[in-house]
Amino acid sequence: MTPSIPTVAVVLKRFETPDEVRHFTRGVFELVTIGGMTIGRATYQPGWRWSVDVGPTVGSDRCRVEHLGLVLQGRAAAAFDDGRVWELTPGSLFHIPAEPHDSWVIGDEPYVSLHFLGASHYAK
């Protein structure tokens, strides 16, 4: 009798073929669901600002989604209503709490980041 070999299911996905895409002025948010987790890739062009380019779509001037992510390219700022402003740069791992905040691209280079937490609720 030949012993049975367990089957291992490996799933590979790419952001080039996302499960969902959310478009807005000067930006796009691509979502891939894998292993029960939704991961987002944000790509924002210079001049992008959450309160201007996403806010009107969701009916708010501030984002209220919690984020855990990694900056791949470009720079952005995240600002809270109490005056705190944080700069996000390539290689930065970031956690932004669900308190109201605005965000914008800094400089002339597109900003790209991965979002591991909050992606399914972002820009919705």
Predicted regions and their residues:
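Glycine- and acidic-residue-biased ligand/ion/polar-headgroup-sensing regions
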Residues: 37, 56-82
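Conserved short histidine dyad/triad with adjacent acidic residue
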Residues: 41-62, 97-98
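A short, N-terminal "cap"/entry segment at the start of jelly-roll beta-barrel domains
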Residues: 1-43, 51
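Ligand-binding loop in jelly-roll beta-barrel domains
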Residues: 97-123
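Short acidic-glycine-tyrosine-enriched beta hairpin
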Residues: 80-99
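Glyoxalase I/VOC metalloenzyme domain signal
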Residues: 6, 46-48, 117-124
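Residue-level recognition of conserved beta-strand positions in structured domain cores
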Residues: 41, 80-82, 105, 115-116
